[in-house]
């Protein structure tokens, strides 16, 4: 079975994670795909395939004769889809021999324009897989799941030599909880790759340092007719706080290695207002500056309006994996070689986000990220192609073979 055929099956299983639940997994529906994958792994010959109570799927293949001394290699992808768009009743559409032009999504009439998505032109002649316009596709990261499963199937069917192979599928990556309960000792790998990136040939080993901040403003309400020199309007103070942040350090004005402050939510009235931010930067020192800047703005406003008017709570989310990958840079070098063996040139760009691999790397399992062949994640314009998924599968097989040498 080819990877895209598995993808078409997996995306029809509803696995959207729930950021509000506070449970692990965040949604019981994630077990539906987990149990399906366990049964599929067992049918392929992965005898120890299992799912734990938190919806983590594990399995392994013992090393083939002569490869017992080779390192244990892990391959990891996540099963959940992002809550940013509906992941229920996904209806994937295949566009065979795609002409490289604008694409109309049939259920809504939405048009994916090449002017907005220039990468589409590079897919000319391939079989493009899109949504029907009503949901996301789920290639993030069910394409990664499908490619790992297909690589495992190929290894077993063809009797390819390999060291110990460890397979892991996680829940809740999209809400930042994918690695939180991952059993690294039970997984059994010396190092691993997540398969959760962009185009075929990408290898990612740098990501943002990340934090979240909640700003609470306490106002003082009096009748507006007699409010002069007395009222403190919390909503106005909130706008003043946000206005003190640099306009050119927002997601919509940054790229590459530029960090940002992202206002995710705001609400309030005269008495109280709240601002929710995420802070991102590849440079840890620059992220610390952003944290300090929030505190400095709060201190200034408290001096202006009174102590306790503005409170800032900051929590770290994840860290740049680069520091943990550098001592194991063979992972990047092997990926580069495997990508070139597949006829592609490696694409190495810092991730403007995070991956399970970043958290796992800091937990002791070095874990760079590989591409899945997907684009436009988290929305109705998400897409991939049959051929790019095939190339990603071949890259995995090349990596397995290189570590068996």
Annotate each predicted stretch with a short phrase:
Residues 2-28, 129-130, 318, 378-379:
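N-terminal capping segment at the start of a domain
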Residues 67-164, 169, 189:
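Active-site metal-coordination/substrate-binding segment of hydrolases
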Residues 74-78, 168-170, 193-196, 216, ...:
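Short beta-strand segments
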Residues 117-120, 126-139, 172-299, 308-310, ...:
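Midchain, well-structured core segments that form catalytic/ion-binding scaffolds
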């Amino acid at each position: 079975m080819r990877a895209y055929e598995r993808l078409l099956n997996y995306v029809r299983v509803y696995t959207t994670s729930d950021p509000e639940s506070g449970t692990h997994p965040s949604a019981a529906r994630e077990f539906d795909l987990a149990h399906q994958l366990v049964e599929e792994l067992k049918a392929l010959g992965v005898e120890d395939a299992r799912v734990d109570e938190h919806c983590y799927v594990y399995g392994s293949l013992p090393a083939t004769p002569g490869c017992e001394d080779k390192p244990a290699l892990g391959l990891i992808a996540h099963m959940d889809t992002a809550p940013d768009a509906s992941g229920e009743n996904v209806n994937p559409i295949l566009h065979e021999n795609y002409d490289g032009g604008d694409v109309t999504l049939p259920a809504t009439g939405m048009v994916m324009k090449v002017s907005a998505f220039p990468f589409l032109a590079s897919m000319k002649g391939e079989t493009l897989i899109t949504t029907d316009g009503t949901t996301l596709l789920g290639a993030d990261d069910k394409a990664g799941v499908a490619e790992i499963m297909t690589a495992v199937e190929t290894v077993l069917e063809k009797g390819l030599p390999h060291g110990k192979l460890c397979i892991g599928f996680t829940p809740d990556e999209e809400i930042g909880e994918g690695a939180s309960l991952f059993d690294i000792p039970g997984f059994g790998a010396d190092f691993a790759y997540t398969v959760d990136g962009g185009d075929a040939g990408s290898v990612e080993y740098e990501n943002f340092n990340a934090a979240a901040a909640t700003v609470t403003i306490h106002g003082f309400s009096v009748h507006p007719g007699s409010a002069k020199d007395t009222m403190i309007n919390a909503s106005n103070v909130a706008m003043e706080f946000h206005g003190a942040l640099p306009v050119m350090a927002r997601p919509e004005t940054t790229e590459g290695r530029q960090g940002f402050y992202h206002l995710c939510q705001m609400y309030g009235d005269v008495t109280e207002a709240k601002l929710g931010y995420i802070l991102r930067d590849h440079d840890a020192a620059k992220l610390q500056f952003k944290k300090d800047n929030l505190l400095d703005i709060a201190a200034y406003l408290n001096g202006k309006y009174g102590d306790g008017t503005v409170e800032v709570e900051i929590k770290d989310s994840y860290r740049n994996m680069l520091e943990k990958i550098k001592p194991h840079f063979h992972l990047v070098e092997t990926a580069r070689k495997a990508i070139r063996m597949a006829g592609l040139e490696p694409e190495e760009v810092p991730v403007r986000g995070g991956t399970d691999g970043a958290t796992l790397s800091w937990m002791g399992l070095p874990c760079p990220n590989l591409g899945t062949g997907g684009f436009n994640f988290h929305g109705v314009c998400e897409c991939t192609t049959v051929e790019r998924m095939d190339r990603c599968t071949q890259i995995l097989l090349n990596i397995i073979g290189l570590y068996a040498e």
